[in-house]
Amino acid sequence: MAYQNALRWKIGGTKENADAAVRILMSWANTCKGVGGDTNMSLAAGIYGHEFANAAELMRDYEGWSAEDFTKFKQWIIKVFYNPSIDFLRRRHDTWLNARYSSLGERPGHYWSNWGLCNALCVMSIGILCDDVHMYN
């Protein structure tokens, strides 16, 4: 709902849309401490991380979002989404190190391309949000 409210505000919505988007983004930043679970957390981090980053990017110039809260949000998104996404892109849960093939047909680096793509999109989106060329590249 943060993205929908942010987009609605950006294309001519009301202050209520903007306030709702910021409230939702900051509620997540103040509550969520990480993405957990099995290896599927990498897929979740990639998908949801870029969605949060895009919503925040739309709200970047909203006067109702304080610089302090915007900075806090960026720190949160790096910790919760950027770090696991870049780790997946670098290590792929160490499946590249696994040289043996299983009877299930798994190969080293066996994750489907959508896993890498959504994590690359997450990393790039957060790099843009944080104005960080190193992250983006």
Language-model features: where?
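Aromatic-lined, polymer-binding surfaces characteristic
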Residues: 1-137
